[in-house]
Amino acid sequence: MNIIEHLTRTVTPILLNNSTDANRSSLLEKLYAILVARFADGHVYNGFASATIADNDTGFFDRLLPDASHRTTLVQELSKHYSVPEQETQSLVSRAAPLVLRELRTLAGNTPVNTFLGSHLSSVASAIPAWAYTFIPASVLGLMNINAAGAAPVVKTTTRTEEHLVATPKEDNGGLM
């Protein structure tokens, strides 16, 4: 089973109100791959395993990816790569996350979602853009045979300042001194 194709058939029409837009559909496919990879990690999924998440819980994405800088980067990258305005991309991402979880729970049935996804990651790996590796737990990257060392490192903001000395000519007052 290709989970990304399934989500594209079931979730995308809801998010796009049954319209067909290649850029938005492609954006959502990449988002689905990233979300599936996050849910495949036991530590990530177990935080939501017994939670009731409403389909319209737009704050769910904030809990799924708690680092605000990661959320911002994810939205900016998707927006840039698929030429969709950032505000609209943010809305699509926030609306998609709970629907994806609901659909994954349905597919998994009585099996824990992360366990179910572990056996379906091969169909997801090729859909994850390299810039998104930083959002995927290293254990999941390993299951997909993606070298975690190749993932973008998480870097805190670094500021570097330098002093530059500039020579200015001295006024000529005449005389020796």
Residue ranges and their predicted role:
Residues 1-177:
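A structural "flexibility-hinge" signal
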